[in-house]
Amino acid sequence: MEPERLKFGGPRELCGAADLISQFKLVQHHEFFCKKSLPVSLSDSHYLHNVVGDTEIRKGEGMQLDQLIESISQSRETNIRIQPFDIDELQESFQLNDMTPVELPPAEKGAPTIPSKSKSESKDRDRKHKKHKDRDKDKDREHKKHKHKHKDRSKDKDKDKDRDRKKDKNGHHDSGDHSKKHHDKKRKHDGDEDLNDVQRHKKNKHKSSKLDEVGAIRVAG
């Protein structure tokens, strides 16, 4: 059975994390760098007090750089100044020889590199492409709108034609009815006139017969 310390990547600490120091054999380095007591010059610095805390560090009056530098006396004695580079020394250090241009055979030459376009050119191209795209969209929108209007206009024309056709049909039907009514009225009027003529003829005949009778009586008397 596998021992507990070798499970899950090796032995674990109290917090549950793996003991990487023992696993990677860093105990000696850990003892040398981490467990070694700090020098007095470092432990007295106010910088460590601000970073680490009050643990075994006496409070200082502020961070002092001379406590962190052991050879501060030597650094003060040396004359520190910035000097510019000497061109002659640089030329002696880096000798540049003029050489003839190297001609490679075609087999060893690589593919020619196409110079990449600058960002401004690519932006201009993208902007132009976007403008053309927007213009095409506007054209398509106008075309659709015009097509829709033309379709609505044709629908209205068809509706007007159907309305006129129905109107003409109704007008023709009404004219037929009107002519029929007029014809019936005329026939009725003609019939009434004929009836009046017959009655008038009868009255005249009856009147003439009466006159004949009166004349005959007068002659006889």
From Swiss-Prot:
Q: Does the keyword Transcription regulation apply?
A: yes
Q: Which UniProt keywords apply?
A: Nucleus, Transcription, Transcription regulation
Residue ranges, annotated region (Disordered)? 101-221
GO terms in the biological process aspect are:
regulation of transcription by RNA polymerase II
Checking InterPro entries in the record gives:
Mediator_Med19_met
Superkingdom, according to UniProt?
Eukaryota
Q: Where in the cell is it found?
A: Nucleus
What Gene Ontology molecular-function terms does this entry list? transcription coregulator activity
Listed GO CC annotations:
mediator complex
Residue spans of biased composition, Basic residues class: 142-152, 179-188
**Biological role stated in the UniProt entry:** Component of the Mediator complex, a coactivator involved in the regulated transcription of nearly all RNA polymerase II-dependent genes. Mediator functions as a bridge to convey information from gene-specific regulatory proteins to the basal RNA polymerase II transcription machinery. The Mediator complex, having a compact conformation in its free form, is recruited to promoters by direct interactions with regulatory proteins and serves for the assembly of a functional preinitiation complex with RNA polymerase II and the general transcription factors.
Regarding protein family, the annotation reads:
Belongs to the plant Mediator complex subunit 19 family.
This protein is called: Mediator of RNA polymerase II transcription subunit 19a
Q: Which organism is it from?
A: Arabidopsis thaliana (Mouse-ear cress)
Which taxonomic lineage does the organism of this UniProt entry have?
Answer: Eukaryota, Viridiplantae, Streptophyta, Embryophyta, Tracheophyta
